[in-house]
Amino acid sequence: MSIKAEEISSIIKQQIENYHSELKVSDVGTVTYIGDGIARAHGLDNAMAGELLEFSNGVMGMAQNLETNDVGIIILGPYTEIREGDEVRRTGKIMEVPVGEALIGRVVNSLGQPVDGLGPIETTGTRPIEAVAPGVMQRQSVNEPLQTGIKAIDALVPIGRGQRELIIGDRQTGKTSVAIDTILNQADQDMICIYVAIGQKESTVRNAVETLRHHGALDYTIVVTAAASQPAPLLYLAPYAGVAMAEEFMYNGKHVLVVYDDLSKQAAAYRELSLLLRRPPGREAYPGDVFYLHSRLLERAAKLNDSLGGGSITALPFVETQAGDISAYIPTNVISITDGQIFLQSDLFFSGVRPAINAGLSVSRVGGSAQIKAMKTVAGTLRLDLAAYRELESFSQFGSDLDAATRAKLERGKRTVEVLKQDLHKPLKVEKQVLILYALVHKYLDDVPVHDVLRFESEMNTWFDHNRPELLEEIRTTKKLPDEAKLEAALKEFKNTFVPSEEK
């Protein structure tokens, strides 16, 4: 069989005409240094800041330093398999995390991958972890209360939806307990909660998750964890992942509470990365942009205006102090960014005042306008009374011959401190908080022994639940105090049934 030359040429022409090649152009670099969660690569001249890069073994990294010859990369995963000389290629994408309703009830890492063993998360939505905060005209002032269920906070330093309220104190002063109790109190408040655990022990995170599950709070909570054993890049990214998940809900008109526990560990992780990337150190060896690290995170908490759906993100960042020093670098930075702070003091904690809130140093700059009218009425003078009591208490140690007015103030102060104490994981509904504070302010507790005050409160709540539920309902629905004559009559009736116990 002979093949003609014309046939061969026509077949070749046909093949050439039908040939479609898709050229894949990608920038590829070479790893020149690897170690401590950091890589340096040569040849990625077109890489963008914050771009995701892929190593030859599939591990992802993020471009942080763009230099003349090298790119400094933080590695988002195990880096022990990466070697000098390995390929690293650009992806053209920036870091994104999965978002949406499917995340609720799950425990995820900084990359949004599940770590709770309950299978993959069925969601297709993603959001970039770095986003521009809402502008001035997109916001409205804080006007809705966020009830924490903690008497000392709701009365003295109220928090509104869309506020940033710093919780600051030494280690082991109950910071995490305040956050967990606040999450537990959101059960019927139409609020989604996100708990971001940064640099915590895995056992601590497990305990927090079990507490939330036990009280049914995981039904509206997402837990983002970057444990102490994780590489520093994951600790640095965890808060941004948490707020990206929150923004998805906020822009859909929902209300979100985000707890960052705690930002001093994130700052330490960022310091570690910056020093490894050879950025110049500043005060306390933190890099120059450590303020921006936190400001760009916390500015994303906002109350959106009604045309954008009126959603909100409320942020509760934590900062750990050393020996109560709130004038250190990170504490002063975050105090200046937030709308107030709650200062937890170790002296108060160890003396049995829990939550150990120092009313003198704690402040809420915008929460007052969100406080309900009933609470404003009863808690108006509480802060001043408490401050006066603390002052008198320190003077009274030096002399016993005090006049009757001073003694009365001291006795009232003792009862105020006692009323503001609260058991762990027992948040109190706002109407019951108003009730006990009304009783305190109107001198119903003046003749109750100090050691009986909490029992008085507990029995009073039970009595009102059974005998005067309509008064509690009125406070809850109208957010104002009920008719004073009815309230006084009910309190007197209960007081007659209360039997003080003998002195211990």
UniProtKB/Swiss-Prot annotation:
The record marks S362 as: Required for activity. It is found in: Cell membrane. PROSITE patterns: ATPASE_ALPHA_BETA (PS00152). ATP binds at G169, D170, R171, Q172, T173, G174, K175, T176. GO terms for molecular function: ADP binding; ATP binding; proton-transporting ATP synthase activity, rotational mechanism. Its main location: membrane. The keyword Zinc does not apply. Gene3D superfamilies: 2.40.30.20, ATP synthase alpha/beta chain, C-terminal domain (1.20.150.20), P-loop containing nucleotide triphosphate hydrolases (3.40.50.300). It catalyses: ATP + H2O + 4 H(+)(in) = ADP + phosphate + 5 H(+)(out). The keyword Nucleotide-binding applies. Keywords: ATP synthesis, ATP-binding, Cell membrane, CF(1), Hydrogen ion transport, Ion transport, Membrane, Nucleotide-binding, Translocase, Transport. GO terms for cellular component: plasma membrane; proton-transporting ATP synthase complex. Produces ATP from ADP in the presence of a proton gradient across the membrane. The alpha chain is a regulatory subunit. Belongs to the ATPase alpha/beta chains family. F-type ATPases have 2 components, CF(1) - the catalytic core - and CF(0) - the membrane proton channel. CF(1) has five subunits: alpha(3), beta(3), gamma(1), delta(1), epsilon(1). CF(0) has three main subunits: a(1), b(2) and c(9-12). The alpha and beta chains form an alternating ring which encloses part of the gamma chain. CF(1) is attached to CF(0) by a central stalk formed by the gamma and epsilon chains, while a peripheral stalk is formed by the delta and b chains. NCBIfam families: atpA, PRK13343.1. This is ATP synthase subunit alpha 2. It comes from Listeria welshimeri serovar 6b (strain ATCC 35897 / DSM 20650 / CCUG 15529 / CIP 8149 / NCTC 11857 / SLCC 5334 / V8). The gene is atpA2.
